[in-house]
Amino acid sequence: MVYQPASGARDLLPLDVEKKRWIEDRLQQVFHRWGYHRIITSTLERMDTLMAGEAIQRQMVIQLQNGEDDELGLRPELTASIARTVVTRMANATYPQRLYYNANVFRRTWESRHNRQQEFYQAGVELLGAGGLLANAEVLLLVADCLAALGLRQWHLILGEAGITRSLLSAFPANLQDKVRSAIAHLDRITIDTLPLSDKLRDRAQIIMDLRGPSADVLQKVSSLDLDEEQREAVNNLKSLVELLESEKKFPLILDLSLIQTIDYYTGIVFEVVNDTESQARVLGRGGRYDQLLGLYHPQRENIPGIGFGLSIEDLYQVLLSTQQLPQVTPASNYLVVPETGSANAAAFAYAQKLRDSTDLVRVEIDLGGRDAEAIRQYARDRSIAQIAWIKADSSPKIESLR
C-alpha cells in the first residue's frame, strides 16, 4: 500500500519551501515598511463565525466534527477570522490597526477533477478602523509595492465599487437579484437574456456589464446614468480615488463596476490584481472594503470600517517561475565536520557549535559515520558543501576546501 496525502492536500519539499519563503519574506518586508504587524488566527473556526452575515457560502467550508454539538470548519479565508479576533480580543485597541497575515486557507471544491487542490497559501493585510479616500489609496498602493518587491511589472488592477454595483442591482425584482448578480459576476449575457426581465431591466443589466474599461470612460458612462444622491456621492469618491492613484505615476488601473466578488461582505471598493504576462489572465489577489463585517462580531454590534487584500502565494509562484528569480536549489551547508576517530566525537560537536555560534548564519553538518574519507568527500560535493573540517583525536581541526 502506498500512503498518499489526503485528497486536495499536498506536501511541500525543501526546494518548494525555499521558493515559497522567498515570496513570503519579500512580502513581509513590504508589510513591515508600511507599519503592519503580523496576526495569527486559528485555522479552525466555529461555523457560526464563518457564516456570520451569510457572506461565505456554506458549501465552500470543509467542516469537521469535534464529538460535541459545535459545528466547526477550516477557515476558507482570513478576513472573518481576523475580524472576530480584533473585536473580541482587542477591545481596547487604538485605531487604525494595521495587521498582516501569512497563512493557509481551505476551500472545498466541487469540480469532478480528482485531487482538486483544497489547501491554499495567502499573504495579505487588513487595515481596520479607517474609512475613506486615504485608507483606500494606502491599500491599493501597498498592493503595487508588494508586486514591485517581487520584481513583477506586468500587471493591472481591476477596481470596482460594491456599493455602486449593489445599488444599481436594487432596481431588479428581489427574487431575481441573486441570479442577475451571479450573471453579472460571470459576465454571463446568455443568462441575462433568458431571465424574465423587462426590456428596460435587461438593458440595465447589459449596461452594468459594460461599465468596464479605462477609468475616464467608465466614470463618464456611470455619471450619465440616472443616479440618486447617494450613488452620485459614491461615484465622486471613486473618481477622487482614481485621481489620487494616478497623480504621480501611471497606476495600471481598469475600472469595472460589474466586478462582484463571490464572498459577499464588501461594501465599498473591490479589486482584483491580474497578471499580464500570460495568454490566460491569472488573478494574483483580491480585496476590498468591508465596513459592516466587524459589526457582526462586535458585542454591541458597533461597525468598524475595514479594508484589506489577500495575495495568492501559489499564483505568484507560477508567475515568478518564468522570471528565474526563485531559488533553484536549497541552501548548501557551509561545513561538514568529521570526527576522524571515536575519541574526537565530543570535540567535533564542540567545533561544529563554535561555527554555528558565529554572528553570521553558518550551516554546519556533522558526519554521522559509516563512510570512508572518499565517500565523505563525495557526499560533500553532491551537497555542494564548501568545506570539510576534519577533527583529529587531539581536538585540532584540519580544514579542507572543496572549491
Swiss-Prot record:
Pathway where it operates: Amino-acid biosynthesis; L-histidine biosynthesis; L-histidine from 5-phospho-alpha-D-ribose 1-diphosphate: step 1/9
One cellular component term from this protein's GO annotations in UniProt: cytoplasm
Keyword hit for Ribosomal protein: no
Pfam families: tRNA-synt_His (PF13393)
A biological process from GO: histidyl-tRNA aminoacylation
Subcellular location: Cytoplasm
Top-level taxonomic group: Bacteria
Protein's UniProt keywords contain Amino-acid biosynthesis: yes
PROSITE patterns: AA_TRNA_LIGASE_II
GO molecular-function term, one example from the UniProt record: histidine-tRNA ligase activity
Keywords recorded for this protein, A-Z: Amino-acid biosynthesis, Cytoplasm, Histidine biosynthesis
InterPro entries associated with the record: aa-tRNA-synth_II (IPR006195), aa-tRNA-synth_II/BPL/LPL (IPR045864), HisRS-like_core (IPR041715), HisRS/HisZ (IPR004516), HisZ (IPR004517)
Other remarks on this protein: This function is generally fulfilled by the C-terminal part of HisG, which is missing in some bacteria such as this one.
Function according to Swiss-Prot or TrEMBL: Required for the first step of histidine biosynthesis. May allow the feedback regulation of ATP phosphoribosyltransferase activity by histidine.
Complexes and interactors: Heteromultimer composed of HisG and HisZ subunits.
Homology family: Belongs to the class-II aminoacyl-tRNA synthetase family. HisZ subfamily.
PANTHER family membership: HISTIDINE--TRNA LIGASE, MITOCHONDRIAL-RELATED, HISTIDYL-TRNA SYNTHETASE
Name of the protein described by the UniProt record: ATP phosphoribosyltransferase regulatory subunit
Species: Nostoc punctiforme (strain ATCC 29133 / PCC 73102)
Lineage summary: Bacteria, Bacillati, Cyanobacteriota, Cyanophyceae, Nostocales
Gene: hisZ
